[in-house]
Each structure stands twice: as structure tokens, then as C-alpha cells.
């Protein structure tokens, strides 16, 4: 699943470790999510979006059959 976590982290001057501690996961989990190698649970996705005070759709881009669906 494509996402903009790295962009939001940069905007808020957070490291992967910082965000991991905030949402209660490991740095490796944040890295895997950013690289699209791990799809977060709905609970974790909401925690990440809430931390940045944005809608979940602004952070995560839903992909169906390899296509990214633009939710804007």
C-alpha cells in the first residue's frame, strides 16, 4: 500500500524511531510500512493519521489490483 508517511514525518521533523514510539510499534515496522512491504492494521493506520491530524486517506493511498486510486 502506498503511503505518505515519510513526507508527513519530514513535515513534522520526526524520525522513524520517533513515530514508532508515538504509535507504539518498532522502527522496523514504520520502515516496512513506508517501503510498502507491510500493510498496517486499520488501528495502526488511524493512529498514524491521527498523530498528523489528517484523514487516513491523506496518509494511505488505497491500491486495487496494482492500481492506486486517488481519493482526492
Regions found by a protein language model. Give the residues of each.
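Short, conserved catalytic or interaction motifs in soluble domains
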Residues: 35, 54, 64
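Key DNA-contact positions within bacterial/archaeal DNA-binding proteins
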Residues: 17, 28, 57
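DNA major-groove recognition helix of helix-turn-helix/homeodomain DNA-binding modules
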Residues: 43-58
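Alpha-helical and His/Cys-centered functional microenvironments
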Residues: 20, 31-32, 55
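Short, charged recognition helix plus adjacent turn
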Residues: 60-72
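Recognition helix of helix-turn-helix/homeodomain-like DNA-binding domains
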Residues: 25-38
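Short basic helix-loop element that most often maps to the first helix and adjoining turn
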Residues: 3-22
Amino acid at each position: 500500500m502506498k503511503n505518505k508517511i515519510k513526507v508527513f514525518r519530514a513535515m513534522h521533523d520526526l524520525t522513524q524511531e520517533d513515530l514508532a514510539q508515538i504509535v507504539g510499534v518498532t522502527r522496523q515496522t514504520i520502515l516496512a510500512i513506508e517501503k510498502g512491504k507491510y500493510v498496517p492494521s486499520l488501528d495502526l493506520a488511524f493512529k498514524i493519521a491521527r498523530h498528523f491530524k489528517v484523514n487516513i486517506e491523506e496518509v494511505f493511498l488505497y491500491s486495487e489490483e496494482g492500481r492506486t486510486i486517488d481519493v482526492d
